[in-house]
Amino acid sequence: AVGDFNGDGKVDVYLTAVGGNHLFKNLGGGKFEEVTAAAGVGGGPGDWGTSAAFVDIDNDGDLDLFVCHYVKWSREIDFEVGYKLVGVGRAYGQPTNFEGAHPALYRNEGNGTFADISEAAGVRVKNPNTGVPTAKSLGVAPVDLDEDGWIDLIVANDTVPNFVFHNQRNGT
């Protein structure tokens, strides 16, 4: 994702990855500084970030951050299952064999840091019967679906229904 999260007029970069994500502040002149830890948007070592979007979810003029996470995966889990292809050897398992992972919504605090408001915003969708995360998010599209001036989010999932998060006009 790209966006000016700190309002300095320079486009910053957020990269998603397996095992943690990375926020790079644009210093100008083609130089970037990693500020992930200081900003509080790295996620955990077991996260599998797949995409992200900078979006002003609370209409306060600064860019908040929505991050898609795919499944709860690790090398240890994958090796434990021991997937193999005949004649080839090592393989990776189907996504249906892994528990989903919650996406994250971070509110920009306006001082270079973000607060995780995922729970309050209702983006941590759980299976009502098991309590496990339902999402296996691959992509997010910010759009004002109802033309009320507040950005809503459409999230594309793998092997489970997609999500539409309607902005409640209160930061959630």
Where do the protein language model's features map onto the residues?
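Acidic, glycine/proline-rich Ca2+-coordinating loop motifs
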Residues: 1-172
